C-alpha cells in the first residue's frame, strides 16, 4: 500500500521501481480521499489536498521520468475537472500555470481559503471535489506542455481520464447514480484505453472521457473517446 499523501513515500517507491526494473510502462493514478456531505470542509481539506492533489503532482513528478517507450501515465479525474465547472471569476487561478509547483501553489491557495472559511465568499464550489479535480487536470496539462514533443516521439501518452459516473461509495452521497455502472463495468473501457496503440496524438495532455456517453454539464453530450473541454 502506497500512501500518496506522504510525498517521501512516492519518491522512495519510484526510486525502488527504477532500481529494480529500470523504468515503468503504465501508471494509473487513481487514489481518492473521500468526503461526506456532513463533513466540515475546513476540517478535512488538509488531508484531502495532500492525498488528491499534492499526491497527484508527486506521482507525476517522480514517475514521468521513468516512463518507457510506449508508456501510459494517466490520472483518473472527472468531467468536473473542466474549468467550466468553476465560476468564471476563478478560471484565472488555473490558467497560464507553467510548472507543477505553480499548480501546487494554486491548489494550496484554494485549500487555505477553505480552511479559513473564505471559500464561499470567493465563489468556490461547496463540494471540494470540483476544485480538486480541476487541480489534477491542470497538473496533467502543465506537465504535458513540458513533455509533449519528447513523449510523442516515444509513443508515450500522458492524459487525465474522465471515467464517467460510477456507482461508488464516494459518489453516492453526492449524486443521483440511478442507472450508473458499477466500478467493474467501467474498468474494461479504461483498460482498453490504456492498452490500445496511441493513434490520436490530439488526446495527449487532455481530459479524455472513456465512459458511457452522458449528458454533458456544459450543454453538450460527452461521448466515449472525446476530449472534455478545458475552458
Task: Report the location of each language-model feature.
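Flexible, glycine-rich beta-alpha linker
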Residues: 81-83, 148-177
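C-terminal helical subdomain
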Residues: 58, 160-168, 175-231
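Catalytic loop of short-chain dehydrogenase/reductase
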Residues: 33, 37-41, 46, 72-152
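Hydrophobic positions on the long internal alpha-helix
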Residues: 55, 59-63, 67, 139-140
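Rossmann-fold cofactor-recognition segment
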Residues: 1-8
